């Protein structure tokens, strides 16, 4: 029969596990010269703005120092950042029958029907037109169905402020 697991931090732990498995597979198959990076951040539940949260400086610091250690000059570092992409993994909630109004009426994620792309009109997630297209193309290539979650704009959403796309100084 089907089983359910309930535990604290399950969304974060499952995202880290899935990311590590994907990174291992990508590293085995990757033929390019660029560096594959996977970061796991802390403090998502309190806004991600701590030193070790996604809104903090640690990712930009690590990438900048890595580029410098590999001999990249400033222009090469800027080029590295401009050809980079980023995915943010988190658990999505399916529609709760008692809180249907918290979801956009046309986007209801269903448990077990594939990963969910989270979209918010106020840019509260790492998704935009480019990242959604890249993600959905990768899922299609892998034969993985994709769902979309669009938050009801009248209901605030929790989010991870991810600074990874910002070029460090």
Residues covered by each model-derived region:
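Alpha-helical metal-binding/catalytic segments enriched in His/Glu/Asp
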Residues: 6-45
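Metal-dependent peptidase/peptidase-like ectodomains
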Residues: 47-143
């Amino acid at each position: 029969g089907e089983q359910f697991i309930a535990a604290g931090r399950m969304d974060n732990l499952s995202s880290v596990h899935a990311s590590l498995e994907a990174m291992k597979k990508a590293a085995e198959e990757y033929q390019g010269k660029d560096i594959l990076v996977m970061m796991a951040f802390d403090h998502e539940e309190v806004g991600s703005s701590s030193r070790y949260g996604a809104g903090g400086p640690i990712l930009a610091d690590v990438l900048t120092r890595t580029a410098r250690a590999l001999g990249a000059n400033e222009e090469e570092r800027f080029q590295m950042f401009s050809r980079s992409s980023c995915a943010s993994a988190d658990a999505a909630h399916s529609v709760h029958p008692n809180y249907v109004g918290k979801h956009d009426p046309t986007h209801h994620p269903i448990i077990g029907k594939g990963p969910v792309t989270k979209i918010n009109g106020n840019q509260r997630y790492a998704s935009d037109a480019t990242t959604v297209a890249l993600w959905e193309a990768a899922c299609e290539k892998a034969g993985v169905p994709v769902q979309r979650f669009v938050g009801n704009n009248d209901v605030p959403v929790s989010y991870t402020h991810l600074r990874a796309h910002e070029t460090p100084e």
